[in-house]
Amino acid sequence: MMDKRTSEIEFHLKNLLACDAYKLSHRLMYPQDTQNLYSMLTARGVYGDFKEFVWNHDFAKEILLNVFNGFVNSVIEVKKNKLLAAALTDKLVSVFNDHELANEFTQHICHLASFLEKNKKMPLVAKIHESDQSLPFRTPLITIEGVENIPNNFVWLVNYFETVLLENIWLFQTASTVAKRIKSLLEKYAKETADETSFINFQCHDFSMRGMSSLQSALYVARAHLQYFTGSDTILGGDNSRSILASEHSVMCADGSKHELKTFQRLLEKFKDKKLSLVIDSYDMWNVLDNIIPRLKNLILMRGATLYLRADSGNYQTLICNPNYKKQDKSTWAMIDYLDHHFSSTINKKGYKVLNKKIGIIYGDGITYQKIEWILNCLKNHGYCSSNIIFGVGSSTYQNLNRDTLGFVYKLTAIKRNNRWIGVKKTPITDLSKSSKGGRYKTKRLITVY
C-alpha cells in the first residue's frame, strides 16, 4: 500500500513528466542562438466528415491553467524536497539509462524553481481562442510563446506541454462537436415533423460512461454532451445532468421468464407517478409488445407519468420503424406500430402522428449519427413525429473518437533567432495534409489567459 510520502512524490512526478519522453531532450536540440519559440494548437480536420468544429474557451483555459499551475508547484517542490529530486532523477535514469541527462535535467528544474519562486509564474504567454459554435479548421486555438526576453535556458517550456494539453483537450472539444452535430440533426427532423422543439433537450441521453476508457474520459464526454442536452446517466458530468428511473436486465430477469408479466406489473405499480424506462428484450420483446403491454394498458394509462419502453438488441432497421411495414402482416410491425395500435396517436399541426403521452420509446443499442438519421427518416416516411423516440448515445459514438477525428495538433510555427522572428512550417511531401501553419498570429479572438 502506498504511504503518504510516496503518494505525494507520485503526484508531483505526474505534474512534472506528463509528456512524451522525447520532450525532455528537445531543450538540448534547438539551435544555441534560439531566443524564443512560438507554438500553436489547432485542429486540422484532415480525416473526418466534419466541415467545422466547436471550441470551448473556458474548458481549454481550465485545463491549461491547471497544467501550468500544477507544473509550477511541483517544480518548486523539487528544490525543497530531496526525496522528490532523487525520485525524479531515478525515474529519468530508468527511462533513458543516462545518468548525465537525468542529473542535468533535475538540476535544471531546480534552477527553474529559483526563477519561479522569484517571478511567481513561468516566463510564458498563453492565449486561447474565444468560444465558438462553428470554427473553420486550422484556426489558431491556443498559442504559447515565451515572454519578451525570456531566459534562453527556459525557451524549451514553450513546447514542453504539448502532450498533456492535447490529451486533455481533444476529447472534450471533439465530443462537443459530435453532440452539436447530433442536436442539429434532431432539430432538422423536429422542424419538419413536430409542432415545437423543446423535447430535443432530453431526446439524446448520454449512455457512454461504462464504455469510456476511464472515469476522466467519461467526465469529459459527459460535460461536452451536457452543453447541448440535459439527459445523461453520468451523474458526475455536470450540474444540469438529468435522468429518470430505469430498469436493466438484472431487474427484468429477477422474477424469471415465466413471471415477466408480473415483473412489468410490479414496477408499473411501484413507480406509478414517476417517469419510468423498462427494458423489453430480456426474453422476447415481440411477446412483450404483442401480449404483455396490452394486458397492462389500463395500468399504463392510469399512471401519472410516461412509460418508456427500451429495446436493447436486434436490427435497428426493423426494430423501431420498419420501411416494409404492412398493417395486415404483424411480422412487419416495429415498436412504433405496436404502440400506436395499443395506445393510439394524435395528428399534430404538421400532419405527423404523436403517440399517447403515457407511452414512449427509448433506444440506445450502438447508436451513431447514421443510425439516428436512418431511424428519424424512417419515422418521418412512416408518418410519425420525431418526438416519439429518445436516443441513448453511448460509447459507439463517444468512445469511437480519437485525436485525428478533428485532427488536433500542437506545432512550432515560429522561432526567434538573431533578434528576428522566423516562420517555421513543416510540409511533408509524403502527406501534405499534415502541413502545419507557419508564423505568428494576431487576432482579438485570441484572449491572453497566462
From Swiss-Prot:
Enzyme class, first EC level, given as a word: transferase
SUPFAM superfamilies associated with the record: Nicotinate/Quinolinate PRTase C-terminal domain-like
Among Pfam families, the record links this protein to: NAPRTase
Q: Where does diphosphate bind?
A: 210, 249, 310
Provide the alphabetized UniProt keywords: Glycosyltransferase, Pyridine nucleotide biosynthesis, Transferase
Which biological process annotations from GO are given for this protein?
NAD biosynthetic process
User: For this protein, what is any one GO molecular function term?
Assistant: nicotinamide phosphoribosyltransferase activity
Q: What is its EC number?
A: 2.4.2.12
Pathway participation: Cofactor biosynthesis; NAD(+) biosynthesis; nicotinamide D-ribonucleotide from 5-phospho-alpha-D-ribose 1-diphosphate and nicotinamide: step 1/1
Which reactions appear under catalytic activity for this entry?
beta-nicotinamide D-ribonucleotide + diphosphate = 5-phospho-alpha-D-ribose 1-diphosphate + nicotinamide + H(+)
Q: Which family would the database say this protein is a member of?
A: Belongs to the NAPRTase family.
The cross-references to NCBIfam families, in alphabetical order and at most eight, read:
PRK09198.1 (NF006629)
Functionally, this protein is described as follows:
Catalyzes the condensation of nicotinamide with 5-phosphoribosyl-1-pyrophosphate to yield nicotinamide mononucleotide, an intermediate in the biosynthesis of NAD.
* Protein name, as recorded: Nicotinamide phosphoribosyltransferase
